[in-house]
Amino acid sequence: MPKRIYIKSILIIGVVMLLGTAAQAADTAPSPYAGQETRAVKALSERETADLLAGRGMGYALAAELNRYPGPSHVIELADKLALTAAQLKRTQEAFEVMQSQAKAIGAEIITAEQKLDTVFATGTIDQASLTVQTAALGQLYGQLRATHLAAHIEMKTLLTPQQTAAYDHLRGYSAPSPGAAPAPHNHGHH
């Protein structure tokens, strides 16, 4: 009996020591944010900043893209394979230019607003009222940016034929809609 108690005691001590070592290691592990404190805008990576300034989509239009609403930049890339008419290509280019111009302007506003939020935290001048105002403004800007990209996808849906949309999805590597998915709306676009 004493031998069993001795072995159990050693096992318990060993487990406690291992847990203590693991807890210590966790305390000294660097944060996944380590190094990000040197960013010009703490909340944005260099890539995100560049994408915002360039008017790129950044995944904001995935709800459209993955539900059979093609994006104008990819429609332009696939123009030959989609057999776009000259009129379709022209309208697609125009839609892309409008979207990109609006997205660039909103992106620049987002960066400015993120810098402002960063500054009030860095200087210790943030308070609840300021936080509420600034985050609401950022939320509105991000919403405008997303709406800008989504609207361009809606425009493409009205411009392309159902066959072109199906070809687009195939060329982009998307599978057919699942059987339970809502049917694609009828296309009454201008061709």
What does each model-identified segment do?
Residues 9-20:
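Bacterial N-terminal signal peptides
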Residues 21-25:
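Sec/Tat signal peptide C-region and signal peptidase I cleavage site
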Residues 1-7:
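N-terminal secretory signal peptides that target proteins for export/translocation
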Residues 26-191:
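Charge-rich (acidic/polar
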